[in-house]
UniProtKB/Swiss-Prot annotation:
Biological classification of the source: Eukaryota, Metazoa, Ecdysozoa, Arthropoda, Hexapoda
Organism: Aedes aegypti (Yellowfever mosquito)
UniProt tissue specificity: Synthesized in the fat body of vitellogenic females, secreted into the hemolymph and accumulates in yolk bodies of developing oocytes.
UniProt-recorded name of the protein: Vitellogenic carboxypeptidase
Gene from which this protein is expressed: VCP
Function per UniProt: May play a role in activating hydrolytic enzymes that are involved in the degradation of yolk proteins in developing embryos or may function as an exopeptidase in the degradation of vitellogenin.
Molecular function GO terms recorded: serine-type carboxypeptidase activity
Coarse class of the protein's main subcellular location: secreted
One GO BP annotation of this record: proteolysis
């Protein structure tokens, strides 16, 4: 999800001599403001941590129940968990219990990318129970992942979406801190819903979530806290996980026919220079080079747009049609009755439009890798990497590039493994490969946001992974 105003990815940072201009990947997908339209009518935000600390668990659950006519057809809960009292840092969440087999269904956390993209994009645009039509009506999604999962959508890191902090020191500057905050959140979540503690626990996300998901998994794996979380696996879609091994854009775009040899030379030179900058820890230099290729510098047209004609790099078939899908989500979230119903009051919604503080604070993290964490996690848990065939910014070949270079239990098996056809109800949904605890999947006719482009196949894929171990 990159160039996605609610969804995903690299969020490279471009610096001028006087200020920081942040690449805003979701800008084209989420337009407008989610500020309350009628101040004073949105109720108060619900902070659950004080209630939990006082042992008022049932009261907290009752207060967290989402109460809005357009959302009442599906049981759900929302509110804030404080993860850093010193800086008043709070994570907003929206929990949707499983529709079927509630007593045994696995838990599935969803983390959007960005960084700075709200997971409410994933909830309303990709895999949640609700979809908002252009006429502002709310419809139920046919292939909602809550049908057989307890879904938890978290605005992560602090400062994303409705999540907030009162201090610059409350923002995350690295993935360790992201994981720590998510760990503090989930510990409180299980106090609020203790009946879920023994359920199989999975973490999923896309784009820059390719870092957040392993960060959360690694924090759980290393935690000595009791009771233990029943972590079973991780699922990463079009993930930005090992950046320096996922920058081979020149070859990829050339093979697609989107650039010629001159364009390939420019991409190869600039990505090589970015890698050199990153290796000497000059992230400002590295980010600026990638920014120039994909989003433009100092108000100038990006090189990608100059040579391809496209601004969006989510789907090379749809091109800029992808960016013209006008989302009404922002307007929906500005409705005072909605805000009151989901317990956010008049708190601002940080949507990555304009100054993206989350991305700014994580600018030194942009090109860092979490591959060593993935490698360690693969020794204990199942990990699914899936990609849309038509994605550019987190393309399938680049995911394979980093997986082929990553040492893990089963790496030699992965290099030898044959790919199989993945079918859903007789249709060719894509291709799959398995080695050790690693599952790799390519979904046909999908771009950066696989669940949105191919909802039926994505639903089958995630269900097979969480319920049958492998596809």
């Amino acid at each position: 999800m990159v160039k996605f105003h609610l969804l995903v990815l690299i969020a490279f940072t471009c610096y001028t001599c006087s200020d920081a201009t942040l690449w805003n990947p979701y800008k084209k997908l989420m337009r407008g403001s989610a500020s309350p339209r009628r101040p004073g009518e949105s109720g108060e935000p619900l902070f659950l941590t004080p209630l939990l600390q006082d042992g008022k668990i049932e009261e907290a659950r009752n207060k967290a129940r989402v109460n809005h006519p357009m959302l009442s057809s599906v049981e759900s809960y929302s509110g804030f968990m404080t993860v850093d009292a010193k800086h008043n840092s709070n994570l907003f969440f929206w929990y949707v219990p499983a529709k079927n087999n509630r007593e045994q269904a696995p838990i599935l956390v969803w983390l959007q990318g960005g960084p700075g993209a709200s997971s409410l994009f994933g909830m309303f645009e990709e895999n949640g129970p609700f979809h908002i039509h252009r006429n502002k009506s709310v419809k139920q999604r046919e292939y909602s992942w809550h049908q057989n999962h307890h879904m938890i959508y978290i605005d992560n890191p602090v400062g994303t979406g409705f999540s907030f902090t009162d201090s610059d020191e409350g923002y995350s500057t690295n993935e360790e801190h992201v994981g720590e905050n998510l760990m503090k959140f989930i510990q409180q979540f299980f106090v609020l819903f203790p009946n879920l503690l023994k359920h199989p626990f999975y973490i999923s996300g896309e784009s820059y979530g390719g870092k957040f998901v392993p960060a959360f998994g690694y924090a759980i794996h290393n935690s000595q806290s009791q009771p233990k979380i029943n972590l079973q696996g991780l699922a990463i879609g079009d993930g930005y996980t090992d950046p320096l091994n996922q920058l081979n854009y020149g070859e990829y775009l050339y093979e697609l026919g989107l650039i010629d040899l001159n364009g390939r030379k420019k991409f190869d030179e600039d990505t090589a220079a970015a890698i050199a900058c990153a290796e000497r820890k000059d992230m400002k230099c590295a980010n600026r080079l990638i920014q120039g290729l994909f989003d433009g510098l100092d108000g100038q047209e990006s090189y990608f747009k100059k040579v391809t004609g496209f601004s969006s790099y989510y789907n090379f078939i749809k091109g800029d049609e992808e960016s013209k899908q006008d989302s009404v989500l922002m307007e929906f979230l500005s409705n005072p009755e909605v805000r009151k119903g989901i317990h956010v009051g008049e708190l601002p919604f940080h949507d990555s439009d304009g100054h993206n503080k989350v991305a700014e604070m994580l600018s030194e993290d942009t090109l860092d890798t979490v591959a060593p964490w993935v490698s360690k996690l693969l020794s204990h848990y199942r990990v699914l990497f899936y990609n849309g065939q038509l994605d550019i910014i987190c393309a399938y070949p680049m995911t394979v590039d980093f997986l082929m270079k990553m040492p893990f239990d089963g790496d030699s098996e992965y290099k030898r493994a044959n790919r199989e056809i993945y079918r859903v109800d007789g249709e060719i949904a894509g291709y799959k490969k398995r080695a050790g605890r690693l599952q790799e999947v390519l979904i046909r006719n999908a771009g950066h946001m696989v669940p949105r482009d191919q909802p039926k196949w994505a639903f089958d894929m995630i269900t097979s992974f969480t319920h049958k171990n492998y596809l």
